[in-house]
From Swiss-Prot:
It comes from the Eukaryota. The tetrapeptide (A-A-P-[AV]) repeats found throughout the protein are also present in many proteins constituting the protective envelope of other species. The keyword tRNA-binding does not apply. It comes from Locusta migratoria. This is Cuticle protein 79, isoform B. Sequence repeats lie at residues 37-40, 45-48, 53-56. One of its GO terms (molecular function) is structural constituent of cuticle. Component of the cuticle of migratory locust which contains more than 100 different structural proteins. Coiled coil: none annotated. Keywords: Cuticle, Repeat.
Length: 131
């Protein structure tokens, strides 16, 4: 359970032991359950913050997909103290990189008609265009 793991938002990442909390908290047993709606939203900067009461809240957000980028969450050091006897287990959990949708972008595309730009190229070729 919650021993030494903290109470996290619980983004279930398979067999990653204590689980990687979406809010940055380490969900001791919640990581295995996971929020189904969370991966589509994708919070990138949250792991340092730690949201406490996240698992009960289900947020419905319609997101216009922006450019997707690969975000590698920071490694999580999980420390667990089991008593009695006092056993300290420390392990480094490297969460897999998540694909996070960037902010929505409105792209105004202009498709001009075929513009023929005649650039008179002197005898020394096209290198002059790059300078």
């Amino acid at each position: 359970g919650f021993l030494g793991g903290g109470y996290g938002g619980g983004l279930g990442l398979g067999g990653y032991g204590g689980g990687y909390g979406l809010g940055g908290g380490l969900g001791g047993g919640l990581g295995a359950i996971g929020l189904a709606a969370a991966p589509a939203v994708g919070i990138a900067a949250a792991p340092a913050i730690g949201i406490a009461a996240a698992p009960a809240t289900l947020v419905r957000t319609r997101v216009v997909p922006g450019p997707a980028r690969l975000v590698q969450p920071p490694p999580v050091v999980q420390k667990q103290v089991i008593q009695p006897p006092p056993i300290v287990q420390t392990r480094l959990i490297e969460p897999p990189a998540q694909l996070v949708q960037g902010p929505p972008q409105v792209i105004h595309e202009q498709t001009p008609a075929l513009i023929k730009t005649a650039v008179p190229a002197p005898s020394f070729g096209y290198k002059s265009l790059l300078h």
